[in-house]
Amino acid sequence: MPGHLLQEEMTSSYTTTTTTITEPPSESLQKTVPLYLEEDIRPEMKEDIYDPSYQDEEGPPPKLEYVWRNIILMALLHLGALYGLVLVPSSKVYTLLWAFVYYVISIEGIGAGVHRLWSHRTYKARLPLRIFLIIANTMAFQNDVYEWARDHRAHHKFSETYADPHDSRRGFFFSHVGWLLVRKHPAVKEKGGKLDMSDLKAEKLVMFQRRYYKPAILLMCFILPTFVPWYFWGEAFVNSLCVSTFLRYTLVLNATWLVNSAAHLYGYRPYDKNIDPRENALVSLGCLGEGFHNYHHAFPYDYSASEYRWHINFTTFFIDCMAALGLAYDRKKVSKAAVLARIKRTGDGSCKSG
């Protein structure tokens, strides 16, 4: 929905490999290296690593500036989705299957694409896979890859501060969708603007999507999913629009948003009890593997975003399938020893690992 774009004022070889990330064995190193760095060995990327030195400035937060266009468009979208829910029983089976497939591909454009590949660099992808993921990400319409990744890196680096775009301390609604309905906090703009995004600026595919994002999302998120059922198997236009477009898109949005809201409020913290992100299996069901959030914030460089790889984690299965085809490689996976060490040191005692 175009209203998303108004939240802020716009100014080699085919060998597949898995990298195991291990914890430094030296006790002296553990005493001198900050917790948020001691298990991360990616020399090329540090912008998603939590920075505990950042603190909010004292004083009241600035007054919220509502983006009424976003509010109105988001309300209309959800009303259209509710009507789509009513139309589900009268829709053709092919339409429901089409909406489901579109949902899954869109979710992978977020999980396997902008999240694990472009935001965190947890694995590498060949050009055919990157093209598929950039298309899938455009289908999902949650801001272009560059902006999404910048916000997400800020979310990790400055988690639960005013510089976190969807700071969960401000409540469920704000972290779920409210942050998209207001102008960004000045700290989000300031800190986000200072992040090193040179890796994405150098990627032509990401910059191409950013340049042509508005017409691309109009085609891939709205026109195509509506046109196909109506044209190819004679679905009623209103069903095509409200079921395969409005309802499907709304479900994709809310499944993703639940990672920011529910997975920061409800669940266990087996890996680090000192941070708000939680393990939430229900969230993982909806977003195909992104709900193991305590683990993900403890180890943001793990390509599976979970200790258990394929368990309620279709996205990891997808990446592994792409690796088997030679399209994904250099998948980074934290070692069992490092995970157990973290559980012992900072876990809440709820983990059954080991």
Swiss-Prot record:
Similarity section: Belongs to the fatty acid desaturase type 1 family.
Cofactor(s) needed, names only, are:
Fe(2+)
Keywords linked to the UniProt accession: Endoplasmic reticulum, Fatty acid biosynthesis, Fatty acid metabolism, Iron, Lipid biosynthesis, Lipid metabolism, Membrane, Metal-binding, Oxidoreductase, Phosphoprotein, Transmembrane, Transmembrane helix
> Record-annotated residues binding Fe cation 1?
115, 120, 152, 156, 296
UniProt short sequence motif Histidine box-2, positions renumbered to this chain: 152-156
Q: What is this protein called?
A: Stearoyl-CoA desaturase
Question: How many cofactor units bind, and how?
Answer: Expected to bind 2 Fe(2+) ions per subunit.
In terms of InterPro entries, this protein maps to:
Acyl-CoA_DS (IPR015876), FA_desaturase_dom (IPR005804), FADS-1_CS (IPR001522)
Segments on the Lumenal face: 89-92, 233-236
Q: Where in the cell is it found?
A: Endoplasmic reticulum membrane
Q: For this protein, what reaction is catalysed? A: octadecanoyl-CoA + 2 Fe(II)-[cytochrome b5] + O2 + 2 H(+) = (9Z)-octadecenoyl-CoA + 2 Fe(III)-[cytochrome b5] + 2 H2O; hexadecanoyl-CoA + 2 Fe(II)-[cytochrome b5] + O2 + 2 H(+) = (9Z)-hexadecenoyl-CoA + 2 Fe(III)-[cytochrome b5] + 2 H2O
The topology of this chain with respect to the membrane is: Multi-pass membrane protein
Q: What does this protein do?
A: Stearoyl-CoA desaturase that utilizes O(2) and electrons from reduced cytochrome b5 to introduce the first double bond into saturated fatty acyl-CoA substrates. Catalyzes the insertion of a cis double bond at the delta-9 position into fatty acyl-CoA substrates including palmitoyl-CoA and stearoyl-CoA. Gives rise to a mixture of 16:1 and 18:1 unsaturated fatty acids. Plays an important role in lipid biosynthesis. Plays an important role in regulating the expression of genes that are involved in lipogenesis and in regulating mitochondrial fatty acid oxidation.
Q: From start to end residue, where is composition biased (Low complexity)?
A: 8-28
Motif annotated as Histidine box-1, chain positions: 115-120
Q: What biological-process GO terms show up in the record?
A: monounsaturated fatty acid biosynthetic process; response to fatty acid; unsaturated fatty acid biosynthetic process
Q: Which residues bind substrate?
A: 70, 143, 150-151, 183-184, 257
Q: Which residues cross the membrane?
A: 68-88, 93-113, 213-232, 237-258
Alphabetized GO MF terms: iron ion binding; oxidoreductase activity; palmitoyl-CoA 9-desaturase activity; stearoyl-CoA 9-desaturase activity
**Can you name the source organism?**
Mesocricetus auratus (Golden hamster)
Q: Which cellular component, as a GO term, is one annotated location?
A: endoplasmic reticulum membrane
Gene behind the chain? SCD
Q: Where is this motif: Histidine box-3?
A: 293-297
